[in-house]
Amino acid sequence: MNASRWTRFSTALLVTGLLTATAAPASPGEPFAGRWALTIPGGHAGWLEIKAENGWYDGSMLWGWGSVLPLASVTIADGVLTVTRVHEVERKDAAGQVVRQQQLTETITARVEGDKLKLTRTAPREDGSGFVSEEFTGFRIPPLPPAPDLQRVHFGEPITLFNGRDLSGWHLLEPNAENGWAAEGGVLVNHAIEPSEGGESHRHFGNLRTDATFSDFRLTLEVNVPAKSNSGVYLRGIYEVQVLDSYGHPVDSHNMGALYSRITPSVAAEKPAGEWQTLDITLVDRHVTVILNGTTIIDNQPVLGCTGGAMTSDESLPGPIYLQGDHGTVSFRNLVLRPVVK
């Protein structure tokens, strides 16, 4: 083949290849791929991620409280996303003894409408007497910005969140919850009494939030968590930094200083229960840094979405600092916040 004929042939192949690539059908999962902020039935915060990896679809979900968990199945067909979640139910006899464990599967279907998601959840009732069907919504979470250069971030004047005398500047997140919070000797203390085994039923103690709301900031505080106790510090009411008696345990995304169920500390830096510990937390551009007792355990890591118990799934909103009060006794002092100055 001479040079001119080869050039024409090569050009034709190139154009044909470009046209073929242009005309290739989009993946059916393309409209659903990414992360979604959900408002689940009851108005609570949820989160969904759908991704295609190695030729198959996968996903994970946060449903109100608890942890981000993998979905049991993900299927996309005819413009409809179908996912399933499985949870166990214990069947007990009259004496309260577990006699049977069953797995219940709920199905969630979704359609994309622009940057919105319209979803329907169908779940069996726990006693097996039929199904419950609920509709809810979501919206696409914008892409994460680059990790900020924290050396260039400017922080404003410090704001003392707790005056050491009373609960001025704070109120219960749930107005009808029992209040275990009090100012005692310059310390913000939560006396949440957990029922003893076989004793009284669980009492719902309230979470405590600041009256003021904030965007990005640096927050420093001291915390004292007794043995086997549990609390949390919610940043903007959306992201929980875990407070837990986890001394001596391997690192885990549910242990002291973790971003609950999302980011595992790089090293275990907690102290034994009953000792005062320091937390230095920076939240900028949806990236978080946590310094526990002088050791950086989360270093400017991206936050992919809300955590369990969030007030909202909308990460664009300013929000309060809120302290978890329903899981056990805990004490805080020297809570100081410095907002980012843009």
Question: Predicted segments — roles?
Answer:
Residues 21-29:
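Boundary at the C-terminal end of the N-terminal hydrophobic targeting segment
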Residues 28-342:
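Carbohydrate-interacting regions of secretory-pathway proteins
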Residues 1-6:
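N-terminal secretory signal peptides that target proteins for export/translocation
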Residues 10-21:
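Bacterial N-terminal signal peptides
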